[in-house]
Structures are given as structure tokens and as C-alpha cells.
Amino acid sequence: MSSRYRVEYHLKSHRKDGFIDWIKGLLAAPFVLHAVSHDGDDNDELATTQRVRSQYAEIFKDIESLVSDKILFDERNDQYRQYIESNDVEEVIPLGQPRLDLLVPTIGTFFTQLPLEKAFLWEDARKAISSRRMVAPSFNDIRHILNTAQVFHFIKQRKLKSKDQLRMCTFDGDVTLYEDGGSIVNTNPVIPLLVKLLSEGVCIGIVTAAGYDEAKTYESRLNGLITALNGSDLPYAKKRNLCVMGGESNYLFRYYEDGESFGFEAIDKEGWLLPRMCTWSQDDLTQTLDFAEKTLYRLKKRLNLPEEAIIMRKARAVGIVPGHFKDPETGNMVKIQLDREQLEEVVLTLQNSLEGFAPAQRIQYSCFDGGSDVWCDIGGKDLGVRALQHYYDPENPIKPSQTLHVGDQFAPVGSANDFKARLAGCTLWISSPKETVEYLRRLIHDE
């Protein structure tokens, strides 16, 4: 019963990724055709595995070609669109769509080529995907293959000393650099990897939903990293390439050292806000947060959420967070837990309600489920990443093809705030801080 429930839950439309599901469907045919028993005959097993591996690899090679075709097609469309805008053309001739858009209508933008065949063979050598007869290639298998392909691309660009080498790497905080609700302590294995990236001239941005207008909280959560950075022999200019973008795109802090003191200093909004963000009126921002707050109070009552659940209003965000209650047996304060279904009902209803609210349509906002709470932030991670791209190099902004965002929340609808980062750069979809470390080691050391 519980197993079936879990499967059905993960098939909900807002939890699926169209591209990964499509690839799973393509791989299902060779898996089903070769899911046979050879009664212990090692030669037949080996032959079947080789045949399955070959067919899987061919599928990924074909997808690789479709991605390349889409990149070229999108570039041509962008050039045509710019030509129309600059020449005031009245008659617009549609150029059509790349084939991948027709096959996967929800597909996003690819900023780089992806060596998917090579990535599959590498993952298959480690995990023996082709040798499985009872378990088909899974969502996680494909997620890892896509991640590995992206890493291989940047390794190749570094070796070629290409103009599209990695220039900026951004990270989510919780579940990416540290466990949910945790912090970077001195023993965190990600620290030397981040310092290594900085030493190679790569800018580092921590783009987090945690929104605070002062630096102390970020200094506390990232203490292990900034302590290591302060004690390193990196040139100060490279140390300064560590920034925190708080509230997704609302507060920017940059690393500094001044004598014995070090930490993060706040950067004035005039120095980094994108032009489109400057056009948002304060009235629209306030009305959007007011509306979201009223919606949360209404949902708290309708869903009979615990009284201890707190609706918290900030300057640029509003959310519902779990409170605490006193355990009658132990006398200790215990954190309440909101059910997964309650969190998703709240975030999806909030998103749907705001979509029909006029002031919200004149700005950008982001509704997401943080795992134990739900928030509505002004802005979004795509804006946070883009702001950093321009802030680090105003004269020659970092391109999406030179940007890598690492995060754990990429579900396409409602509950995931890393999803929008796909609009601003390449991405790695990880599920734990351990995976972040593994991919960074591979990226840096070509392991």
C-alpha cells in the first residue's frame, strides 16, 4: 500500500520533468526487449548486455544530435527576432520549431552542447545500467547522465582554453552545500573545492532563498567557508569573487577582509539591480505580498493547519513556517511537521492565485516549497543569477554558456525555486551535498 502510494505520488504532473520522462520512454523499448533470463549462461548474458549498451548509447547519441540542432535553431530564431526588432519589420515569417520542441513541448533552453553518449558510457561503467534486467533506467540514472554530460562539456572547454570556459558557478544553500537547515562547518568537504574554483578565477555565487538584509546570518551559515578563505593565500581580488545573493534576487553581499575582520558586506542595490527590476513599483510589490499573505491565512484555516504554524512577513517575502509546541511528556519544545501534501497544496494554490492577480503580473515572484515551509519571494533565482553575471563583469557580462548553477529543486511547476535558474545558465540537478562534492571533484580534477 505504501509503496503504491509513493509511486502514484511521484507521478503527479507537477513533480515530473518532461525531458527526463521522454528519455525514460525511449530507453524503455530496448530494456523490455532484452529483459530475459539466460538461465545462468554467462556468454548470453554478456552478449545481451553489450547489445543493450549499444542501443542505449545510440539513443543518447541521437538525443545529443537533437540538442545540437535545437541550439542552432534557437540561435537562428534569436538573430531573426533581433533583426525584426531593429528594422521595424511588419510582416513576421515564423521560422518553425526545432524537432526537440515538438517531441518535448516543455523543453527549455540549452546553452551548451551535451556529450550524452560519452556521459552514458561513463555512468554505465560505474553503475552497470545496461546489465540490469528487472529495473529499467530510472529518473535518477538519467539525471546523473545529464549532469555528467554538462560536467564533461566544461572539462572539454577548459582543456581547449575556449572562450566558453566556466566563469561563474552558483549554488543553492540547503541540501546543496549543506543539509537542510544546516551550515558549512570547517570540516565540510566542499570548502577546498570552492576555494580551488576561486583560485582558478571562477566566480562563486551562493543564490539562496534565505532572505536577510544583514550579513550576520549568512556569515554564520557559511562560517567554515569564509574562515578557510580568510586563511588561504589566494589574492584578495580572487577572494572577492565570493558573493551571496539572498532572498533569491533581493540582497547582495560580497566577501571582504579588513585587517583582522572578514565576512560579507552589503552591496547597494544601485550597483547590481537589473534594469527590469528597477521598473517594478513599490505598490505592486506591496500588494502582491499582501495578497499572498491573505491567501496563506485563508489556507491555514481551510487546511486546518496547526495553530503553531507561523505566517511570517518580510520586506520582500512572505511565508508559512513550522512553529514549535511544548511536549507534555518531556516538557521540551518540539518543532511541528507539516505534511507533504499540505505543503504542496499551499504552494500550488498560492501560485495559482497569484497568477490571476494583476499587480503580481507586473513584477516577478517565486512561490516554492522549502521542504518544511512555503514562501513567496519577490524576484527569482533566474534574476539572481543574471544579476551576478552582470555584477562580476559589467563590461563583458558572463554568458549563460559560461555559467553553472547547482541546486536540488528543479521540478518544473510551483514547488521548486532552482527551476528558474535554467533560464540564466547551465545546471546540475543534485539531491544531496554529497553529490555536489562528487560533481565538483569531477569538474575540477577530471576524475
Curated annotation (Swiss-Prot):
Signal peptide: none annotated. Allosterically activated by ATP. ATP binding is a prerequisite to magnesium and substrate binding. ATP binds to 2 of the subunits in the homotetramer inducing a closure of these 2 subunits and the release of the C-terminal loop, thereby activating the enzyme. The keyword ATP-binding applies. It catalyses: IMP + H2O = inosine + phosphate. Mg(2+) binds at residues 172, 174, 408. IMP binds at residues 172, 174, 180, 208, 373, 381. Its EC number is 3.1.3.99. ATP binds at residues 126, 144. One of its GO terms (molecular function) is ATP binding. It comes from the Eukaryota. One of its GO terms (biological process) is nucleotide metabolic process. The active site is at residues 172, 174. Keywords: ATP-binding, Hydrolase, Magnesium, Metal-binding, Nucleotide metabolism, Nucleotide-binding. Its cofactor is Mg(2+). SUPFAM superfamilies: HAD-like. IMP-specific 5'-nucleotidase involved in IMP (inositol monophosphate) degradation. Belongs to the ISN1 family. Homotetramer. This is IMP-specific 5'-nucleotidase 1. It comes from Candida glabrata (strain ATCC 2001 / BCRC 20586 / JCM 3761 / NBRC 0622 / NRRL Y-65 / CBS 138). The gene is ISN1.
